[in-house]
Amino acid sequence: LSEKNEFIEKSKREMNVSGFGFGSMGGFYTLAEVLSELDNMKVLFPNLITTKVSIGNTVESRPMYMVKISDNPEIDELEPEVLYTALHHAREPQSMMQMIYFMYYLLENYSTDPAIQYLVNNRELFFIPVVNPDGYEYNRITNPTGGGMWRKNRKNNGGSFGVDLNRNYGPYAYWNSPNGGSSTSPSSDTYRGTAPFSEPETINIKNFLATRNFKNALNYHTYSNLLVYPYGALSNETPDSLIFREYAMDMTEFNNYTYGTDMQTVGYSTRGNSDDYFYDGDTVLN
């Protein structure tokens, strides 16, 4: 408790963030608490953030919520759009917590920080803090004080449960890459599903992307201190790898994260992941 209080006071003092706190699930926000935080942001900063909007329902019929932060959040302005997602994997709540903190940082410092003013005034920032609400709620039910290790969604596979949402993206050539970067066994933590976009959660993301014109996207995970960019499914680098490296050098200057492709960072290949699809798996981010 003393460490939590110390963090909160340091955050107020050094980062001017007072809205962020700790949740009831081992310090992490529960799903209900995440939604409450989004509502609270709207009450406190009605001119900078939208009301939460569902982009579709999950396999267990839970809504997947999105909000937008911008200087005119209710208007679609001709500004570059950026997408942030978290909790593809239900056992990575720190990804969501970091996102909520970042959102409060933007909102609470907007009136005093010129850099944040520029960002919010000249970009449209979209946030999906819980891509996998079913899996996350399952962890709360089975481990209410925290520590739940369920990773996948809660698809009933007929004897086992769950599809790894970050192995369920298309296109087929990426999803079915011969690199072995996912499993065909329904009981595996990296089970890819029966086909690309077999799950409502990934379909919801795909459909949402098709309605926007995103110029960049960051998908938050919590495995190690890494900044990972495409490709995961292919052995070659992208045509934009030099640009990715330049961005990555700037983004890791202070945290010293390792950056690169899947093989260059985590040391293994993946297939059907969100980064590859967002990059060139469809026309949405091209």
Segments the model singles out, each with a brief description of its role:
Residues 95-139:
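Short helix-loop-beta-strand segments that form the rim/entrance of peptidase-like active sites
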Residues 39, 43, 103-112, 132, ...:
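Sec-exported extracytoplasmic/periplasmic mature domains
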Residues 75-108:
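Enzymes and membrane/adaptor proteins characterized by extended Gly/Ser/Thr/Asp/Glu-rich
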Residues 26-82, 152:
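Soluble metallo-hydrolase cores and metallopeptidase-like ectodomains found primarily
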Residues 145-286:
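Metallocarboxypeptidase
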Residues 34-37, 94-102, 119, 123, ...:
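Stable alpha-helical elements in mature extracytoplasmic
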Residues 1-22:
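Extreme N-terminal flexible tails
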Residues 51-56, 63-68, 81-85, 92-95, ...:
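Structural recognition of the beta-strand scaffold that forms the well-ordered cores
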